[in-house]
Amino acid sequence: MASIHIETTGNGPDLVMLHGWAMHSGVWDGVVESLSQRFRLHQVDLPGHGASRDCALDSLDQMTEVIADRLPGRYSVCGWSLGGQVAIRLALQAPERVQQLVLVASTPCFVRRADWPWGMEDSTLTLFMENLARDYTQTLNRFLTLQVSGSEDQARVLAWLRKSILRGQPPTPATLQAGLKILQTSDLRAELNQVSQPVLLIHGRNDVITPAGAADWMQQHLPRARLVLFPHCGHAPFLSFPEQFVSCFDAL
């Protein structure tokens, strides 16, 4: 198996940065300069993404295990969306290594269920999987549009996301379909109360991919959680409000 790509910059306590589905570690570029003045950042390309493109993406547990082998002995972790689920898994699998979590626009369960109203329709994710094989570019564009929905600066953030994807070699359709399958099937709700570390939840109030109700639920069920809600913000608060996003790390 090819190795995971990690870019390390800055000085200070170790902070691991995990991006979301279909993206790569460069998505954090707008906040790296500020954060690297306070932390030693480890920007990870998830399996099948970015410079880790040749590393197979199989499951949430596989992602966690492959990444954990490359991380410092002790670290905090910031995960966006799918990266947030990887962060939760890291904290559960090796609590002695993970000091704190920052979960950005994340959720324990991406799909709406009878007892979980704060998710996407299962049929929507299935349609994304089917359409990736038919029209890769258009399907990615549709997902990026969902990410910026609800933001007051949708055009700017959408342009930035599109530019960010083009900066690296995009994931294969098979990788993206495998990632969507993880989003469709993973449900960490029953395990969430076992996360003993302090958790900072950063969420956009208008997020349509991981609705803010999911963040409220996590705050209630995580033993040591604090929630920061960004108004007029969708699924990418670190792109819509980079300065405010960085200021949230003052509490770490």
Curated annotation (Swiss-Prot):
Binding site for substrate: 21, 81-82, 143-147, 235
GO annotations of cellular component type: cytoplasm; membrane
EC number of this enzyme: 3.1.1.85
Molecular functions per Gene Ontology: pimelyl-[acyl-carrier protein] methyl ester esterase activity
BP GO terms, sorted: biotin biosynthetic process
Domain AB hydrolase-1: 15-239
Catalytic activity of the protein: 6-carboxyhexanoyl-[ACP] methyl ester + H2O = 6-carboxyhexanoyl-[ACP] + methanol + H(+)
Compartment(s) where it occurs, according to its Swiss-Prot or TrEMBL record: Cytoplasm
Top-level enzyme category: hydrolase
Pfam families hit by this protein: Abhydrolase_1 (PF00561)
InterPro entries on file: AB_hydrolase_1, AB_hydrolase_fold, AB_hydrolase_sf, BioH
Keywords: Biotin biosynthesis, Cytoplasm, Hydrolase, Serine esterase
Superkingdom assignment: Bacteria
Active site: 81, 207, 235
Pathway(s) where this gene product acts: Cofactor biosynthesis; biotin biosynthesis
HAMAP family: Carboxylester
Function statement: The physiological role of BioH is to remove the methyl group introduced by BioC when the pimeloyl moiety is complete. It allows to synthesize pimeloyl-ACP via the fatty acid synthetic pathway through the hydrolysis of the ester bonds of pimeloyl-ACP esters.
PANTHER family given in the database record: AB HYDROLASE SUPERFAMILY PROTEIN YCLE, MONOACYLGLYCEROL LIPASE
Record's subunit section: Monomer.
Protein name: Pimeloyl-[acyl-carrier protein] methyl ester esterase
